[in-house]
Amino acid sequence: MQDHIIEALGVQADIDLDSEIVRRVNFMVDYLHHTRANGLVLGISGGVDSTVGGRLAQMAVEQYRRVNPDWTGKFWGVRLPYHIQGDADDATAAIEFIQPDEDIELQIGSATDALGEAFTAALGEEPTDYNLGNVKARMRMVAQYAIAGQYNALVVGSDQAAESVTGFYTKFGDGAADIVPLAGLTKTQVRDMGTRLGASDRLIDKVPTADLLSDNPGRTDEDELGMTYANIDAYLSGQPIPDEAREKLEETYQRSEHKRRLPVGPADTWWE
């Protein structure tokens, strides 16, 4: 199964960072041209994935602008706090590194809380903390698509292979996007790319956390997954990992397959 997963996610164990940066920027430039979109939008959390994805997006917009001087498109880097975020300074540091054409802060707190209150009024019970965490992620994507819709832009996703293999994202939340420039990269490769692009150690080494749970803020990805990124990256690079970790990862991959697919229909057989 390991070879199948590696092939399905398009992971390459060895990459040339400089060539890969150029390839991924060119990919975004080509897709902008193909779609006639007027820019790119990405939510910036301060984690390494959105930091690297954001910098690549800004580079792509600048390159497209050089080739098409009449083009009026931009890159919108969007901070999307739920009330007061404990890691707001990291998002600010990421924005300072990325230098997006437009730096926007759009507060999702009141909209998320309003939906939670409407949910309680309709169902007679409060949403669970886990459910509300996914609502936060989906509200952030609603906000990004609202900006993209206003300016005929594309929403950029920051999903990479270590998240894709585990399905560690909210379906139709942070898993929703028009273009995913980090696809096929391991977490280690994303960090290495960030270093090559000049991001600070603070941003590169930030402990990954979705930070969606109000009852357990800052819970790390690895704690929630029950797996380490070191083992996930090793597996995706074709290396052996402990049997228990391999079995858990492969079971998680199979269980989360629906997240990597379009909504299932009667003619689909992949789920059987």
Where do the model's predicted regions map?
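Residues on a specific face of well-ordered alpha-helices
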Residues: R55, D89, A93, V142, ...
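Catalytic subdomain that performs nucleotidyl-dependent activation
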Residues: W71-K74, P100, L132, S158-G226
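Repeat-unit-sized solenoid/scaffold elements
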Residues: A60, G109-P127, G175-T188, E222-D243
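Low-complexity, flexible helical/coil segments
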Residues: T112-A118, A137-A146, T188-A199, G218, ...
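Peripheral terminal appendages
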Residues: M1-L42, V48, V52-L56, N216-E272
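ATP-dependent adenylation/nucleotidyltransferase module used to activate substrates
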Residues: Q2-T166
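Alpha-helix boundary/capping residues
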Residues: I98, A118-A122, F172, L197, ...
